[in-house]
Amino acid sequence: MPGYDYIYLGDNARSPYGTRSFEVVYRFTRQAVETLFNEGCQLVILACNTASAKALRTIQQRDLPQWDPARRVLGVIRPTVELMDKISKSKHVGILGTNGTITSGSYSLEIKKMFPHMTVTGEACPMWVPLVENNEFASPGADYFVRKHLEHILATDPEIDTLVLGCTHYPLLIEKIKTCLPAGITLFSQGEYVAASLVDYLHRHPEMDARLTKQGSCRFLTTESAAKFSDAASVFLSHPVEVEQISID
């Protein structure tokens, strides 16, 4: 969707969220959403599985009606879950995520709600985000931690045929993950499916689409060092970006 205007806010000063409590994740996420609303955003996507798991519902139900009922805050878990029954043939799915995402049980609850016949196994991978954040995703340490968690989840449920990368950092480890997986296992990365779900959402809600500006601009905001964020973003995007440092607490 390149024609739309985007503001990306990375709360890098307080990341990772994965090990933090529900209350702290909610507070941080609420502050971030309010900041984006103050910047003029009409629709905010929580492009973080931990924030989607621990803060989305409270923000939607408690905060949004007070801020502006016409605006929307959406997450990344439901668009992922909706596809699981089509992708998994064995109906045994594994979720790779942060401690926060896995302990919240959000994936398991959502999958069981939609597809009661499916079996869901979660695996917390607490070192994966720091490896990516520190640009060590090609290191021997990454080899060790990737193999360790994949072996553990597949030993826990040998019938798993689909593994979900339940964190937006994890695609940078995807090639390393693929080398550790046995044949016959589908690796599910969220990005393109969440984007497709957003396109579908805007088609079904033309009133929201009409509220979105469409000049093709993109701003990047961070709560930490702009230079450090720019270096990390260039790894994800394969090109340099201009970044603004802000405070949201």
Predicted feature descriptions by range:
Residues M1-D249:
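Non-catalytic structural scaffold of enzyme domains
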